[in-house]
């Protein structure tokens, strides 16, 4: 996958900017707070996903404006010897709540705009920013989101199944919730409804967990090999999926814990309570990993995510690396730069001196104004 060009209007602190990336490496330099990450974030939105920094869509729009607009030309990879793929044009609008069309909408090649989530899978990308260090030290929810976000890009049906699971889970929790302000359903009726919801949860949960397990068979070996290179073999990384049930066992688990859930007033089991355990020398990284080890673990996962996506889809995702090189020693930096070869990669940096001799493109961002160096 390649981004051929990008035009940004009224996006965060960027009034107007045009980017014409290099075929492989594109570097965006500038001091902190100038808008480098904003530009990477704009590229990421072309995946159809939400901002990797969190927050509401309205926060993406430049202060005083109703809309932000992103226009991009993209091109899919083709096997060597084949005719190049036709470029696709994406136009995305991000509207504030006061705008005529609030939220994120995208149109491809002039078609009618759809919700931006419909872009899932059409522009594969992998992003790393310092906030992703929470993958190691943070709550299990962040590690589940990491898996689910990757799978939503790779398999169009995964997003639909995941949304169904979440919707049924919300209905189940609403049914289970105790409230002093509303009349409770008769116990027998509540139990019957719970069995219906559990049947649907089991069907969706089994399918989602199977995809997660299959994906990890590709991701885990690559991530662990990457870590061995980054750490020079100092520690051994391993990954374990902490499942609540074995394949085919979710329906039984839900039946076994039904009475307990009725008493607790909430759902107590399912794929939304599973975790991805990251280990260094068989010890939990969330407890023992240093800051440098955390960074190496997350980088290993992200590079493995890109490699797994390339194997599954047949094309390399675009890499978006925010402030990733600043804290790496020369050996780790060179390994990472080697991994970037033959992949379109966007890197932000506060220091442009080490990139001025690159074969790629170098831009500088100052106060939301982008200029080629």
Name each model feature, range by range.
Residues 72, 344-351:
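Structural recognition of the conserved hydrophobic beta-strand(s) that form the central parallel beta-sheet
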Residues 108-109, 280, 366:
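Structural motif
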């Amino acid at each position: 996958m390649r981004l051929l060009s990008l035009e940004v209007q009224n996006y965060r602190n960027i009034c107007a900017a045009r980017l014409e990336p290099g075929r492989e490496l594109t570097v965006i330099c500038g001091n902190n707070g100038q808008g480098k990450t904003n530009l990477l974030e704009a590229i990421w939105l072309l995946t159809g996903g939400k901002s990797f920094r969190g927050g509401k869509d309205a926060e993406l729009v430049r202060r005083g404006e109703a809309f932000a607009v992103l226009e991009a030309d993209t091109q899919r990879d083709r096997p060597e010897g084949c005719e190049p793929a036709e470029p696709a044009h994406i136009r995305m609008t991000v509207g504030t709540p006061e705008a005529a069309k609030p939220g994120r909408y995208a149109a491809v090649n002039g078609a009618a705009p759809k919700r931006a989530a419909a872009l899932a899978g059409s522009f594969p990308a992998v992003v790393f920013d310092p906030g992703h260090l929470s993958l190691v030290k943070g709550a299990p929810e962040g590690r589940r989101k990491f898996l689910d976000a990757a799978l939503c890009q790779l398999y169009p049906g995964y997003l639909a199944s995941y949304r169904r699971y979440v919707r049924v889970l919300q209905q189940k929790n609403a049914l289970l919730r105790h409230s002093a302000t509303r009349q409770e359903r008769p116990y027998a009726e509540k139990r019957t409804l719970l069995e219906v919801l559990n049947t649907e949860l089991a069907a969706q949960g089994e399918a989602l967990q199977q995809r997660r397990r299959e994906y990890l068979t590709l991701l885990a070996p690559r991530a662990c090999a990457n870590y061995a290179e980054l750490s020079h073999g100092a520690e051994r990384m391993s990954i374990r999926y902490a499942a609540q049930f074995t394949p085919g066992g979710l329906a039984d688990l839900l039946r076994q814990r039904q009475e307990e859930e009725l008493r607790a007033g909430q759902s107590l089991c399912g794929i939304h309570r599973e975790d991805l355990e990251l280990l260094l020398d068989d010890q939990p990284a969330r407890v023992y990993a240093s800051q440098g080890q955390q960074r190496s673990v997350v980088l290993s996962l992200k590079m493995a995510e890109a490699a797994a996506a390339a194997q599954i889809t047949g094309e390399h995702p675009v890499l978006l690396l925010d402030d990733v090189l600043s804290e790496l020693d020369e050996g780790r930096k060179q390994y990472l730069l080697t991994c970037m070869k033959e992949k379109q990669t966007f890197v932000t940096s506060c220091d442009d001196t080490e990139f001025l001799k690159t074969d790629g493109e170098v831009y500088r961002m100052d106060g939301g104004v982008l200029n080629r160096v």
